[in-house]
Amino acid sequence: MQRRDFLKYSVALGVASALPLWSRAVFAAERPTLPIPDLLTTDARNRIQLTIGAGQSTFGGKTATTWGYNGNLLGPAVKLQRGKAVTVDIYNQLTEETTLHWHGLEVPGEVDGGPQGIIPPGGKRSVTLNVDQPAATCWFHPHQHGKTGRQVAMGLAGLVVIEDDEILKLMLPKQWGIDDVPVIVQDKKFSADGQIDYQLDVMTAAVGWFGDTLLTNGAIYPQHAAPRGWLRLRLLNGCNARSLNFATSDNRPLYVIASDGGLLPEPVKVSELPVLMGERFEVLVEVNDNKPFDLVTLPVSQMGMAIAPFDKPHPVMRIQPIAISASGALPDTLSSLPALPSLEGLTVRKLQLSMDPMLDMMGMQMLMEKYGDQAMAGMDHSQMMGHMGHGNMNHMNHGGKFDFHHANKINGQAFDMNKPMFAAAKGQYERWVISGVGDMMLHPFHIHGTQFRILSENGKPPAAHRAGWKDTVKVEGNVSEVLVKFNHDAPKEHAYMAHCHLLEHEDTGMMLGFTV
């Protein structure tokens, strides 16, 4: 029996004996056990197979059609080693086209899996990934233009775990699914018959698609039996449009050890951790007593996202300590970040994100008509209208003829697959200035093919846990600056993407292609 299997059996057996009598039945019956994605490693030929298909999943007692990689919902965690090439064979068993994007990986445009990397129904695509970047938690998901939001909503997402020599020398928790736990958080909206209820319309093109049910690794409010000691959580905000703000129900601190692109120089202690759509953070939390506690998400001031039940702290998962000790530690130092180079003489690119004023107004009107003032998340409606210079929106009924599919733009242009906007020089630092001035919507801006450093975020210096390697930056009614460098080729036919990771904004034009 392998050590991991032995530990799993030990944990399972230990749960019953470690809990008081009154809570054993509760643990067994009240909540589902946190599903743990398989950790997928290469076969003898250094290959990995991913099959995209439809299946069925049960939520709240009702069965829904869902999509997954190698299963009914979500997918495995693909384990990659720095310096080792891996070929991934991707089979599409859906009845429609899809793509598979390696979010956070520094790989050439040809294998990045953007909207050009189409896999037809019944088709296959093989990509070879030569990983040369630090240990990190990344992920993979569809990037089919105009349909990314729907395909992710249906269940397509999986993790990528990159390992290197440096991280293996640290005494971090590393028993997969025991004290090293993936946590993929997504909200879903269901129809009355229990199916995933996705719409791309004026309202969702403006504020994004959101639901009233929170899933953690595909389960509603699951529980995890955690050994005593340090518990490592690999957090992914896999929501289409909802930002999250993680905390613990008993106010025990989170120690952030890694962001999108890898380890921070040292742990950063926080009481709450905002995470934007597409972002990953690794945190350690101390499980040093017998008291169960919840990982929760706190209310956020984002349009549409303060509607019940998210107007109050909402449970993500229950963590139940058991009478087994883990061996992981919280190191004082983690990694070394290179000093920022001089910014003198660098190419500066200015990207202005914009939403059609008509879309902004019509979407907001529909949101308020459906959900009331609570949908405004505490924002002053008149101030917002004034900020956008729109005046009264009650005259904005265009009978549904408004073309929202190209209403979101960058530098005045909606996405055009055949026209990259610019060419970045390979191996050269550039300073990108990304502005959201002109609307009050949240735009988590993601850049393919790189891990960058944030120079300023929404007009302020980045928080300590956001000053490491990142692939997504917050833009919300202000300006953010990032220092980027691209080490791989991305010719016109395999251009990289840069876009808002609120998926409905991306699907309706807020994306550009660029070459390297």
UniProtKB/Swiss-Prot annotation:
Uppermost EC category: oxidoreductase
Binding site for Cu cation 4: 443, 500, 505
Regulation acting on activity, per entry: Ferroxidase and phenoloxidase activities are enhanced considerably in the presence of excess copper ions. A labile regulatory copper ion near the T1 copper site is important for the copper associated activation of enzyme activity. Ag(+) acts as a potent inhibitor of oxidase activity by binding at Cu(+) binding sites, blocking Cu(+) substrate binding and oxidation. pPD oxidase activity is strongly inhibited by sodium azide, an inhibitor of the electron transfer.
Key words, A-Z: Copper, Metal-binding, Oxidoreductase, Periplasm, Repeat, Signal
Binding locations of Cu cation 2: 103, 141, 501
Influence of pH: Optimum pH is 6.5 with 2,6-DMP as substrate. The pH dependence of the reaction as monitored by oxygen consumption shows a broad activity peak between pH 5 and 6 and a second activity peak at pH 8.
Result of altering residue 8 to R: Small increase in export rate
Range of residues in the leader sequence: 1-28
Compartmental location: Periplasm
Co-factor requirement: Cu cation
Gene Ontology CC entries for this record: outer membrane-bounded periplasmic space; periplasmic space
Annotated ranges, domain Plastocyanin-like: 55-165, 227-292, 402-516
Manner of cofactor binding, per the entry note: Binds 4 Cu cations per monomer. Contains a mononuclear type 1 (T1) or 'blue' copper site, and a trinuclear copper center consisting of one type 2 (T2) or 'normal' copper site, and two type 3 (T3) or 'binuclear' copper sites.
Any one GO MF annotation of this record: oxidoreductase activity, acting on metal ions
Induction summary: By CueR, in response to increasing copper concentrations.
Post-translational events: Exported by the Tat system. The position of the signal peptide cleavage has been experimentally proven.
Effect ascribed to mutating residue 441 to L: Strong decrease in oxidase activity with 2,6-DMP as substrate. Affects copper incorporation into the T1 copper site
Enzyme Commission identifier(s): 1.16.3.4
Xref: PANTHER family: BILIRUBIN OXIDASE (PTHR48267:SF1), CUPREDOXIN SUPERFAMILY PROTEIN (PTHR48267)
UniProt subunit comment: Monomer.
Family as reported in the entry's similarity comment: Belongs to the multicopper oxidase family.
UniProt remark on domains: Contains a methionine-rich region, which includes a helix that covers the entrance to the type 1 (T1) copper site and blocks access to the T1 site in the absence of excess copper. This methionine-rich insert is involved in the binding and oxidation of Cu(+). It also binds additional copper ions, which are important for the copper-associated regulation of activity. The methionine-rich region provides at least three additional Cu(+) binding sites: Cu5 (sCu), Cu6 and Cu7, which play related but distinct roles in CueO oxidase activities.
Protein name listed in UniProt: Multicopper oxidase CueO
